């Protein structure tokens, strides 16, 4: 089922970085380069004594490092594996589980590494290769305790293998999602599995209450491609979805109804570089953004994500498959790990800075009607703009104490306002635009435009007063998309035919010849 879209704008309002800076609110504590080629996946482990460890997918194996209080790193073990540019890791209990696309004899499958003897040693416990030879990604349920790991993109099925690791020395496959196309990555919350169907450009949502019998709830299509990875907020009301292709934005969805996700926001730090992997911890999301490094978003309001920190790990040009591959922000100390392709493991600290947000509405100063498609420009980013939705709404956020906004709409005088902001809170504002007065374009009283019946089955009749030449009308969907339009209205009676228009709520908007909103009224088809 396709998703629905609410008003969305690129996250251009999040920040205005200085060109010379490569970090904001993120401090580098430690770094480790295995020196054997490209690095990739990373994960964390905490021993019974509270010591913290980082695990890094290196070119020739898995590096295991103890993290000191200040972020200093000491290698405690290195578990060899088939050479590969891609090595992914997760940890369940006292064991790490590692997959790679590297080949070897015997077939590598999934390595199981016993971490319980750290810091003295770590050892390969077993290799599970009865269900697959190689795998691209391995995941677990990050926010719940489950005895399962999930392996995606395998050479045998290209699907998702559900492996019971309650006995780490004897893993057992207990489920398989094999849709007949390639699943690149997945994310698990409770009994729900989200699967990235890379080449299909869809996200599959499954009920895995019975791991042996995954049930497809929804196959969500959207205007992206190369569906790559995703993560959910702690309350599981929102999901952040990334595409592995330069030039594509990442998207935030309201998933309170899994059968009909609603897109509520988008994000990119730089369209030239793809958004690779998201990791959510509390009110923050930590994103690996390839050549743009680590990016931190404040998602206190997931529908208005605001960038509040970053650390650039790549000195070259933006774009392509370089820079930061993975991150892991789940250590009790709050330290953040990252696997950078060129030079290995990074350890960071983020200072938990939050943004201030604004929630605005643009209205007609005379009629009070919301103004659709008004253009809102942030002074710090004059080349980019946000457009109001069918409610005249717009929103944004910033680390600054105040932002200056300019609001414009044809048929109205433009207006510039300064909005004071406070970290961690939201400010509501109303911007009233004054119509450019002419003898024939004053707003209409709502009672002079009558629509009936509504709700309607097949058609709605609109009774209109005498209108100036050049008056136009449009029927908008609740997503702000045009459904029908009428040009040069010269009649007092207009019929809105339903035709193939789906049942639902719509908005009838009447415009003056200069683009001023004369009236806005709801239309409902049953």
Region roles according to the model:
Residues 1-23, 440:
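Bacterial Sec-dependent N-terminal signal peptides
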Residues 356, 380-382, 468-470:
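Short, small/polar residue-rich loop motifs at catalytic or cofactor-binding pockets
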Residues 20-366, 386:
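Feature marking well-ordered beta-strand scaffolds used for ligand recognition
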Residues 367-372, 378-398, 419, 488:
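Short, acidic Ser/Thr/Gly-rich low-complexity loop/linker segments typical of extracellular
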Residues 372-377, 399, 404-416, 443-452, ...:
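C-terminal outer-membrane/trafficking sorting elements
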Residues 348-369, 429-452:
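Residue-level detector of functionally pivotal "anchor" positions at catalytic/ligand-binding pockets or at interdomain
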Residues 394, 427-429, 492-496:
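Short strand-edge motifs at loop-to-beta-strand transitions and within beta-strands
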Residues 418-425, 432-434, 522-526:
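Short beta-strand edge segments in extracellular beta-sheet folds
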């Amino acid at each position: 089922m396709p998703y629905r879209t609410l008003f969305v704008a690129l996250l251009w309002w999040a920040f205005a970085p200085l060109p010379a800076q490569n970090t904001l609110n993120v401090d580098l504590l430690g770094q480790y380069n295995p020196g054997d080629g490209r690095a990739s996946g990373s994960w964390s482990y905490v021993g019974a004594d509270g010591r913290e460890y980082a695990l890094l997918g290196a070119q020739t194996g898995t590096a295991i490092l103890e993290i000191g209080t200040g972020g200093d790193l000491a290698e405690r073990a290195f578990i060899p594996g088939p050479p590969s540019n891609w090595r992914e890791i997760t940890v369940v209990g006292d064991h790490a589980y590692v997959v790679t696309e590297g080949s070897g004899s015997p077939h590598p499958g999934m390595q199981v590494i016993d971490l319980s003897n750290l810091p003295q040693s770590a050892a390969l416990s077993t290799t599970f290769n009865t269900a697959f030879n190689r795998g691209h990604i391995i995941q677990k349920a990050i926010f719940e305790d489950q005895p399962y790991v999930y392996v995606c993109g395998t050479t045998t099925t290209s699907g998702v293998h559900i492996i019971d690791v309650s006995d780490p020395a004897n893993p057992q496959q207990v489920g398989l999602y094999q849709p007949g196309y390639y699943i690149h990555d997945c994310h698990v919350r409770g009994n729900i599995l989200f699967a990235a169907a890379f080449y299909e450009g869809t996200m599959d949502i499954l009920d895995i209450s019975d791991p042996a019998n995954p049930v497809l709830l929804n196959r969500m299509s959207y205007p992206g491609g190369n569906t790559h990875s995703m993560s959910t907020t702690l309350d599981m009301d929102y999901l952040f979805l990334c595409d592995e292709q330069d030039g594509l934005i990442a998207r935030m969805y309201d998933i309170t109804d899994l059968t009909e996700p609603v897109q509520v926001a988008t994000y990119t730090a730089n369209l030239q570089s793809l958004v690779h992997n998201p990791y959510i911890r509390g009110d923050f999301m930590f994103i690996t953004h390839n050549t743009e490094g680590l990016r931190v978003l404040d998602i206190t309001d997931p529908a208005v994500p605001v960038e509040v920190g970053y650390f650039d790990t790549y000195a070259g040009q933006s774009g392509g498959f370089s820079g930061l591959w993975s991150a892991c922000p789940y250590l009790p100390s709050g330290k953040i790990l990252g696997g950078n392709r060129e030079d290995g493991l990074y350890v960071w600290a983020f200072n938990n800075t939050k943004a201030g947000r604004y929630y605005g509405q643009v209205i007609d100063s005379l009629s009070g009607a919301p103004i659709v498609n008004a253009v809102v420009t942030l002074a710090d980013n004059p080349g980019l703009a946000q457009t109001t939705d069918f409610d005249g709404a717009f929103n944004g956020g910033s680390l600054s104490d105040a932002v200056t906004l300019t609001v414009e709409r044809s048929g109205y005088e433009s207006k510039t306002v300064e909005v004071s902001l406070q970290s961690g809170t939201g400010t509501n504002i109303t911007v009233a635009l004054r119509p450019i007065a002419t003898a024939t374009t004053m707003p209409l009283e709502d009672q002079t435009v009558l629509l009936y019946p509504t709700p309607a089955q097949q058609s709605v009749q609109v009774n209109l007063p005498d209108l100036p030449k050049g008056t136009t009308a449009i029927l908008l969907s609740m997503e702000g998309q045009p459904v029908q339009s009428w040009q040069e209205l010269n009649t007092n009676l207009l019929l809105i035919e339903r035709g193939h228009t789906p049942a639902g709520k719509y908005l009838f908007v009447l415009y003056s010849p200069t683009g001023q909103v004369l009236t806005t009224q709801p239309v409902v088809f049953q």
